[in-house]
Amino acid sequence: MENNLQVNIFCIQKSDEFKTCSEKYSKLISKYATLKEINVFNKKIALAQNLNAIEAKKSYEEAFMPYKKGYCIALDEKGKDLTSIEFAKLIQDKNELSFFIGGAYGLREEFNQSLDFRLSLSKLTLAHQFVKTLLLEQIYRAFCINNNHPYHK
């Protein structure tokens, strides 16, 4: 299968406790798309997070701005709830997908509104490290749905 689709996941995290699980889904996704996972955590973000939520969110946005390309999706607890089938339809027929996972303070409302879509994986507040793993699984599931693979039953 030819991988014409580019999937980018941009996140802000110090460590990846779920690395083994994330790698499993990254490998499975590679059958359907080229996947890039980019952690943009830097010293400026670390300092801003120690100041306050406003400065932290500004630093996240500055780190993410150069990567706004393709169909851009913010992961946001206030975003739209989708079923796996609805998510599969959302990402179908796109050439490039860019997902943005905020840090400990989430993302600024203005940044979220500047993107193409806001997706909620849950109404619960989730650790951003876990969100990436959950997102990878749902991307893989969506590809399986769109390609009639039996993974999604």
Swiss-Prot record:
GO terms for cellular component: cytoplasm. It comes from Campylobacter jejuni subsp. jejuni serotype O:2 (strain ATCC 700819 / NCTC 11168). CDD domains: RlmH-like. Belongs to the RNA methyltransferase RlmH family. GO terms for molecular function: rRNA (pseudouridine-N3-)-methyltransferase activity. The keyword Membrane does not apply. Its main location: cytoplasm. The keyword Cytoplasm applies. S-adenosyl-L-methionine binds at residues 75, 102, 121-126. It is found in: Cytoplasm. It catalyses: pseudouridine(1915) in 23S rRNA + S-adenosyl-L-methionine = N(3)-methylpseudouridine(1915) in 23S rRNA + S-adenosyl-L-homocysteine + H(+). Its EC number is 2.1.1.177. Homodimer. The gene is rlmH. This is Ribosomal RNA large subunit methyltransferase H. Keywords: Cytoplasm, Methyltransferase, rRNA processing, S-adenosyl-L-methionine, Transferase. Specifically methylates the pseudouridine at position 1915 (m3Psi1915) in 23S rRNA. It holds the Pfam family SPOUT_MTase. SUPFAM superfamilies: alpha/beta knot.
